[in-house]
Amino acid sequence: MMKLFRVIGYFSQLRAFIGFKATCTFTLAYIRNKISPPQESALAHIPVGPYVFYFPSISYFDGLFSEIFFKETYIIPYTDAPIRVIDCGANIGMSLLYIKIRAPHAQVMCFEPNPAARLVLEKNISENNWGEDVQIFPYALGKEKGITEFFVEDKVATSSGGSIVNHLEKRGRSLNSYSVEVDTLSHYIESKVDFLKIDIEGPELGVLEELVAQQKLRSVAEIQLEYHYIPGFFTRPLSEMLSLLEKNGFHTFVEPTAPPHHVVGHET
């Protein structure tokens, strides 16, 4: 019974995003993918409102879609304005899908160093004709430019948990690694940024410190980020990040979830 109530609740939430008819279409396509999943290495797809979203497996879709649409990880009010958004850690494009549903004319910069995830991201951009509005940059982000190894789970090539540190190996996970370029974010910010999303599995504080050093954080109106404390690798406390943001004119909201997400915005 509780599961039925949860499904009804999810249906109502999605209807608020894309309308009743589109939610029915989505539900039928979702059930088809559950019953008859795509062959290994083939991409599945589901219509989500006016768009079609491609993904490697229904279980992978479940996790990302639930986090972003049902748990409402991101909060962007609906707007027709061409807002400027930076998506750090775009993965296969689920956050981009949310952005485009909430702000259809948004101009978005996507950063994604994982080549497998980036291929699916490119597919979603191409199939939905977002090419004029969306740019992809194949870089990891950090406090300094350079070259580093990027680690991804062997069993999930598109994993959203890819990181520049191999902390998952200590948990017994088998990892693949790629050599990737690390870039700094500041020189991509030349004018106001309406929304900055950061989910990069560890180096969040370094990215923000670089923006402060280059006097670019003041150009950002709102930030949502996922803070990662990774023992042995990224161990600076959350209080340092909150202090940095507050010193630069933001007020902060901390939402403890698993993993924790944090929404911050300028004081008014």
Regions picked out by a protein language model, each given a short descriptive name:
Residues 1-268:
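Phosphate/nucleotide-binding beta-alpha loop and adjacent structural elements of enzyme active sites
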